C-alpha cells in the first residue's frame, strides 16, 4: 500500500468516522459501487481524502465542470502535500469543433486555442500514473475522450541514467520522433537543445528543465534546473522523458494505417458514387488524399484525430483508450456531485455522434471518424474498477447499483442544522419576501432568491432595487470571472441579495447566506424537482439561522419529499448535538480566492488609473459593432471589446451555435488586425 500522507488540522467528527469506516470496508471488501449521501457542509471532501488514504489506491476524482474540479484539486492538495494530486481537464481555452450546417451549406473548420499550462498538467497526470501509486487525479468529464495508447506512450519514453554510455545522435532522434523540437537558442516545454556536452530538455509535463551532462558518450550527471535562472534544483540518478504529445504512432503502425485509410476511402467512394452523391464523393476524395499525403510525408495532418481508429489499430466500434486506461487495474473512482456527473457521461457521446453523422453524410469525413469519440456511458462503467458516488442528492441509478451500500453523512462538524423550511402562499409573495430581506440585511446576513424564468428574475431584481435593496442578478450570459466576482461581492457584503434562475450549478457554499427563497415552488419541473429543491434548500445550510422559504399554493410530491428529507436530517443533527452538548457555530470559511485577488488589483487599477472608463467605452463599442460592423471604434476600447466578443464566441460554441461562433471569430480577427495597424 502506498504511503498516502493525509495532513489536516482536524480529525473526523460527527458521522464522518462511520461513513469513512463503511466506505473503506466496502472498497477493501471488493464492493463495486457505493454511495456517500452527504449533506451540504458535512465535509464530504475530507471523507473522500480519508477513504483514499486508508485504501491506498490510485484514485480518479471526477467532477462535472472545470471549476469544481479546480476546487477539489486545491482541497486535496492541502490534504496530501507530499503525494501526487494532479489536475486533468480539457486543455482548450476555446474549442469550436468541425461542423457542417446543411441548411445554409456552411462548413466550419475546427478552431481551437490550447492552454499550455493545462496541457502540462495533463502530461503530469499521466507521468505520475506511470511512476508512482500514491496518485490522485482530479478530472472533468473530458477524461472520457481518447488519449493515445498508454502502452505506446510508455514504450516511447527516452530513458537517461547516470553512468550509462549513449549514442547521443540516436537519443536526439528519439526525442524528435516523440515530437520534441530542437531549438538551440530558446529552450521551452516540448523543446531540447544541445550545446557541447550538455543536453537540456523541456519535458512536456514539467516547468523545470532536465539537464543531461555528458563526458564523451557517458552520462555524468542528470539535474533539474530552473529554466530562467539556471539554478540547480535537484540531482537525479535516472530520468524518463515521456513524449511531448499523448498520441504516439510508431512508423510501422503509421504505414499500416495509411493503407487502411486508402482502402476505406475506396469503399466509401464506391458507395457515394453508387448513391449518386457525386459532389460528396469528390469532396471526400480531395480532402482525404491531401490528408494521406501529409501523413505520409510528416506523420501528421490537420484533423489527424479523425483517423484515430486506424492509427491506433482499433476495430470498428471499439472504445478509444482514455485517461482511465493509464490507471492500474485496482484504481478507485470517486464521482463528485454524482447526480449531475453520471448523466453527463452518456450525453457527451450522443452530442458528438450527432455532429459527426452530418460530416460523414456530406463527404467531409470517412465513416471511421465516428470512432474518434468519447466513451459511451456503458463503456465507461465497464472500465471503472470500484466506484464511490458522492452527492447530497444521489440519483436513482447510483442508489440502485449501490444496493444497500449507502453511507450517510448528515452531521456537520460545526453543529449547524439543516435550514427550517416554511411554505407560504404565493399571494403577496414579493412583498412578504421584501420584509424578510430587510430583516436579514439589518443583521448583516445574505439572501438567495431563485425564480423560474429569466424574465421573472429581471423583474424581481428591478422591484427590489426600486425599494432600496442592494441586489444583483446572476444569469447565464455573465462570464465565469464576473460570476466569481459577483459571488465574492455577496460574501463581502457589497450587496445583500442575489437573484437567479438556477443557482444550483454555481456550487454556492456561502456561510453568510441565512435565507433561501424559492418562488413558485409548486411548479413541477427540473428546477422544482425533489433533488433540485433539496440542493437549493441546502444553500442556507451553513448558517446557524438558516431558513428556506417555499412560496407555493399547492404541496407537490417533490416539495413533500424535499421537506421530509430536510426534516429527517435536521432531527438527526439535533439529536446528535443534544447528546454531545454541541452548540452550533458559524462556519469560518474565509472569503478569499486567488482569482479574485487578481480581480481586486484589476478593479483598483480601473478606479485609480486614467483608463477607469474603458469598460463602459468597450460596452458601447460592442453595441455599436453589433449595429454596424464597420463603425469607427477607439483603439483603446478594442482590447476590452475583443474580450467581450471572445466570451460570446465561447458561449455560442457551448450551445453548438457554430455559425454564430464562426461569425464572432471573424469579427475578432478583424479587430485584432485593426489593433495591429
UniProtKB/Swiss-Prot annotation:
GO terms for molecular function: ATP binding; ATP hydrolysis activity; DNA binding; excinuclease ABC activity. SUPFAM superfamilies: C-terminal UvrC-binding domain of UvrB, P-loop containing nucleoside triphosphate hydrolases. Keywords: ATP-binding, Cytoplasm, DNA damage, DNA excision, DNA repair, Excision nuclease, Nucleotide-binding, SOS response. Pfam families: Helicase_C, ResIII, UVR, UvrB, UvrB_inter. It is found in: Cytoplasm. CDD domains: DEXHc_UvrB (cd17916), SF2_C_UvrB (cd18790). It comes from the Bacteria. Residues 639-674 form the UVR domain. The keyword Protein biosynthesis does not apply. GO terms for biological process: nucleotide-excision repair; SOS response. GO terms for cellular component: cytoplasm; excinuclease repair complex. A motif (Beta-hairpin) lies at residues 91-114. ATP binds at residues 38-45. Residues 25-412 form the Helicase ATP-binding domain. Transmembrane segments: none annotated. The keyword Cytoplasm applies. Residues 429-591 form the Helicase C-terminal domain. Belongs to the UvrB family. Forms a heterotetramer with UvrA during the search for lesions. Interacts with UvrC in an incision complex. The beta-hairpin motif is involved in DNA binding. The UvrABC repair system catalyzes the recognition and processing of DNA lesions. A damage recognition complex composed of 2 UvrA and 2 UvrB subunits scans DNA for abnormalities. Upon binding of the UvrA(2)B(2) complex to a putative damaged site, the DNA wraps around one UvrB monomer. DNA wrap is dependent on ATP binding by UvrB and probably causes local melting of the DNA helix, facilitating insertion of UvrB beta-hairpin between the DNA strands. Then UvrB probes one DNA strand for the presence of a lesion. This is UvrABC system protein B. The gene is uvrB.
Amino acid at each position: 500500500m502506498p504511503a498516502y500522507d493525509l495532513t489536516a488540522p482536524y480529525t473526523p467528527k460527527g458521522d464522518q468516522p462511520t461513513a469513512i469506516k463503511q466506505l473503506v470496508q466496502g472498497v477493501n471488501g471488493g464492493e463495486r459501487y457505493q454511495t456517500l449521501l452527504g449533506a451540504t457542509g458535512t465535509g464530504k471532501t475530507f471523507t473522500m481524502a480519508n477513504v483514499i488514504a486508508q485504501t491506498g489506491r490510485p484514485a480518479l476524482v471526477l467532477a462535472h465542470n472545470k471549476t469544481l474540479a479546480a476546487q477539489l484539486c486545491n482541497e486535496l492538495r492541502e490534504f496530501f502535500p507530499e503525494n501526487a494530486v494532479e489536475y486533468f481537464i480539457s486543455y482548450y481555452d476555446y474549442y469550436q469543433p468541425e461542423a457542417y450546417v446543411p441548411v445554409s451549406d456552411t462548413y466550419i473548420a475546427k478552431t481551437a486555442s490550447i492552454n499550455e499550462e493545462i496541457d502540462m498538467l495533463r502530461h503530469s497526470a499521466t507521468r505520475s500514473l506511470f511512476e508512482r501509486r500514491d496518485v490522485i487525479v482530479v478530472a472533468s468529464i473530458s477524461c472520457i475522450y481518447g488519449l493515445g495508447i498508454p502502452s505506446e506512450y510508455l514504450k516511447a519514453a527516452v530513458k537517461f541514467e547516470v553512468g550509462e554510455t549513449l549514442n547521443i545522435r540516436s537519443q536526439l532522434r528519439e526525442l524528435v520522433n516523440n515530437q520534441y523540437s530542437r531549438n538551440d537558442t530558446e529552450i521551452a516545454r516540448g523543446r531540447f537543445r544541445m550545446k557541447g556536452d550538455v543536453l537540456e530538455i523541456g519535458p512536456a509535463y514539467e516547468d523545470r528543465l532536465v539537464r543531461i551532462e555528458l563526458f564523451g558518450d557517458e552520462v555524468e550527471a542528470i539535474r533539474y534546473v530552473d529554466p530562467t535562472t539556471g539554478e540547480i534544483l535537484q540531482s537525479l540518478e535516472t530520468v524518463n522523458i515521456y513524449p511531448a504529445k499523448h498520441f504516439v504512432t510508431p512508423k510501422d503502425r503509421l504505414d499500416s494505417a495509411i493503407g487502411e485509410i486508402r482502402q476505406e476511402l475506396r469503399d466509401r467512394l464506391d458507395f457515394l458514387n453508387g448513391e449518386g452523391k457525386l459532389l460528396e464523393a469528390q469532396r471526400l476524395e480531395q480532402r482525404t488524399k491531401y490528408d494521406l499525403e501529409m501523413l505520409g510525408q510528416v506523420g501528421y495532418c490537420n484533423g489527424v484525430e479523425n483517423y484515430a481508429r486506424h492509427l491506433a489499430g482499433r476495430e470498428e466500434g471499439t472504445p478509444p483508450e482514455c485517461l482511465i486506461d493509464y490507471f492500474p487495474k485496482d484504481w478507485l473512482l470517486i464521482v463528485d456531485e454524482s447526480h449531475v456527473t453520471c448523466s453527463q457521461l452518456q450525453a457527451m457521446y450522443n452530442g458528438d455522434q450527432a455532429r459527426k453523422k452530418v460530416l460523414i453524410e456530406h463527404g467531409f469525413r470517412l465513416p471511421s471518424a465516428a470512432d474518434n469519440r468519447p466513451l459511451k456511458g456503458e463503456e465507461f462503467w465497464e472500465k471503472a474498477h470500484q466506484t464511490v458516488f458522492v452527492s447530497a442528492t444521489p440519483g436513482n441509478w447510483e442508489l440502485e447499483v449501490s444496493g444497500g451500500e449507502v453511507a450517510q453523512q448528515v452531521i456537520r462538524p460545526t453543529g449547524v442544522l439543516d435550514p427550517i423550511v416554511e411554505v407560504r402562499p404565493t399571494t403577496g409573495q414579493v412583498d412578504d419576501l421584501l420584509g424578510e430581506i430587510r430583516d436579514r440585511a439589518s443583521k448583516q446576513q445574505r439572501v438567495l432568491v431563485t425564480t423560474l424564468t429569466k424574465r421573472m428574475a429581471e423583474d424581481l431584481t428591478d422591484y427590489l432595487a426600486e425599494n432600496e435593496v442592494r441586489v444583483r442578478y446572476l444569469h447565464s450570459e455573465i462570464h465565469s470571472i464576473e460570476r466569481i466576482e459577483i459571488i465574492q461581492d455577496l460574501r463581502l457584503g457589497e450587496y445583500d441579495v442575489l437573484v437567479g434562475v438556477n443557482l444550483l450549478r454555481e456550487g454556492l457554499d456561502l456561510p453568510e447566506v441565512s435565507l433561501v427563497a424559492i418562488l413558485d415552488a409548486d411548479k413541477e419541473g427540473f428546477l422544482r424537482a425533489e433533488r433540485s429543491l433539496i440542493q437549493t434548500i441546502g444553500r442556507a445550510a451553513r448558517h446557524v439561522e438558516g431558513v428556506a422559504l417555499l412560496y407555493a399554493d399547492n404541496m407537490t410530491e417533490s416539495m413533500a419529499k424535499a421537506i421530509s428529507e430536510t426534516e429527517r436530517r435536521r432531527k438527526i443533527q439535533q439529536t446528535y448535538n443534544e447528546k454531545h452538548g454541541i452548540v452550533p457555530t458559524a462556519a469560518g470559511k474565509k472569503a478569499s480566492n486567488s482569482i479574485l485577488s487578481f480581480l481586486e488589483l484589476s478593479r483598483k487599477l480601473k478606479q485609480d488609473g486614467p483608463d477607469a472608463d474603458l469598460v463602459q467605452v468597450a460596452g458601447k463599442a460592442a453595441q455599436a459593432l453589433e449595429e454596424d460592423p464597420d463603425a469607427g471604434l477607439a483603439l483603446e476600447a478594442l482590447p476590452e471589446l475583443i474580450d467581450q466578443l471572445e466570451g460570446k464566441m465561447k458561449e455560442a460554441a457551448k450551445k453548438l451555435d457554430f455559425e454564430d461562433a464562426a461569425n464572432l471569430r471573424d469579427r475578432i480577427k478583424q479587430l485584432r488586425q485593426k489593433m495591429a495597424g
